[in-house]
Amino acid sequence: MTQTLRAGVIGAGVFGGYHAAQYARLSGVSFSGVYDTHPNRAARVAMPLGGRAFADLESFLGAVDVVTVASPASHHAGQALAAIAAGKAVYVEKPI
């Protein structure tokens, strides 16, 4: 049985938008959406790609299996550790 991975992005900037677009086009991947501390930015990136804008990190982590952390660097560690603690596969944009 083939598993569809639910993927999402933390951070709605340039890098987050790039990762979101790549997830949305991959076969075997369902693009869940984007979490950003500014929900309107998350919506701007997620909605055209068929994803949701998440207003809180916990809800976002409940909706994904795989996450890219592409937020400002000062938030990387905390967000990545939260995703790891939630059992998610995590890719962190540099710097880690």
Segment roles from a protein language model:
Residues 1-49:
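N-terminal Rossmann-like dinucleotide-binding module
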Residues 19, 49-96:
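Beta-loop-alpha module in the N-terminal Rossmann-like domain of NAD(P)-dependent dehydrogenases
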